[in-house]
Amino acid sequence: MSSTVTSVFTFKVESTFDEWAAIFDSKEATRRHREFNIQPLYRGCSDDDPQKIIVIHQHPEGNIEKFVEANGDWMASHRVDLSTMEKAAWTWTDNSNVQFKAA
């Protein structure tokens, strides 16, 4: 049985969304995400504040924390204001291998 987490992050950037997205969509960012088995699902910016970003990822439990710990300096160097980062996590468990018995 394995747990998959869907993480929703919001944070501010000190650049434009397009500048930040170019880095997020880069081969280097893809390599770093894959290293921690993180699948980006969505990224966008707020209509009210174009410097407020939302990112949604899916990953094994605990991997996003390892990613941020290993890559925090790299993220900050791309003008991400880590002090504004907020996270919500949504978990589901894959029970596809569980055998159910009739009562």
Where on the chain are the PLM-derived regions?
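Acidic, low-complexity intrinsically disordered regions
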Residues: 16, 70, 86-88
